[in-house]
């Protein structure tokens, strides 16, 4: 059984890697965002508790998020293993998760950090641009328009960049994430379950390296 967390800064490629891992190993992909939406829509007790904070614009306390994660990990689709997306974000959450996995007898088997140099991440994240006419999203590095300056979808010629994709904003976002990511890495390194892969390779090669780590266990 594989019970896994992927770590990495925004733009490191965690989403793409998660999809490949789920496809090959048939793991339950557990995203905290999806969990919140589902629990609130189904009006479960924990979902309603989370909603009371979200409706006021407050952050959902760690204990409530942890309850939601525990509820989700009890579902039958996690019997082959799971990959956690968006939790834990802090060492406090990591400790709460440790309690949950012990209670459910579903210990974490792997924590894999996808490492990408900060300058590369800034280039990746600030390369996004959007068609003014139809909203189609492109990336100068990984997904440019087929004809330069012309939208593939509507043929429009005007594009814009979102404020939060501008290099100085991206840099600040990475700094904030790094402050949370580093203690988490240290936490799992001490537990002896942290592995790292080079995220500056092609998505296929990144998955190949992750696959080697997961196949060892």
From Swiss-Prot:
Positions of the UniProt region annotated as LID: 127-165
Pathway the protein contributes to: Purine metabolism; AMP biosynthesis via salvage pathway; AMP from ADP: step 1/1
Tree of life domain: Bacteria
Alphabetical GO biological process terms: AMP salvage
SUPFAM superfamilies with a match to the protein in the record: P-loop containing nucleoside triphosphate hydrolases
GO molecular function: adenylate kinase activity; ATP binding; zinc ion binding
Family label: Belongs to the adenylate kinase family.
Name listed for the protein in its UniProt record: Adenylate kinase
Organism, as annotated: Lactobacillus gasseri (strain ATCC 33323 / DSM 20243 / BCRC 14619 / CIP 102991 / JCM 1131 / KCTC 3163 / NCIMB 11718 / NCTC 13722 / AM63)
Gene: adk
């Amino acid at each position: 059984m594989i019970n896994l967390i992927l770590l990495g800064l925004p733009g490191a490629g965690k989403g793409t890697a998660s999809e490949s891992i789920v496809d090959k190993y048939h793991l339950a992909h557990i995203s905290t965002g999806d969990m919140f939406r589902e629990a609130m829509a189904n009006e479960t007790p924990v979902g309603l508790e989370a909603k009371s904070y979200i409706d006021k614009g407050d952050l959902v306390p760690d204990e409530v998020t942890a309850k939601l994660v525990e509820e989700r990990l009890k579902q039958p689709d996690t019997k082959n293993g799971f990959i956690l997306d968006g939790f834990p974000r802090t060492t406090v959450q990591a400790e709460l998760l440790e309690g949950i996995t012990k209670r459910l007898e579903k210990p974490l088997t792997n924590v894999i950090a996808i490492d990408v140099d900060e300058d590369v991440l800034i280039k990746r994240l600030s390369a996004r641009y959007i068609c003014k006419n139809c909203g189609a999203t492109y990336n100068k590095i990984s997904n440019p328009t087929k004809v330069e300056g012309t939208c593939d979808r509507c043929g429009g010629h005007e594009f814009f960049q979102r404020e939060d994709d501008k290099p100085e904003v991206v840099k600040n976002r990475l700094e904030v994430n790094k402050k949370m990511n580093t203690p988490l890495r240290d936490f799992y390194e001490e537990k002896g379950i942290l592995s790292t892969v080079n995220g500056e390779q092609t998505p296929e090669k990144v998955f190949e390296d992750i696959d080697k780590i997961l196949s060892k266990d």
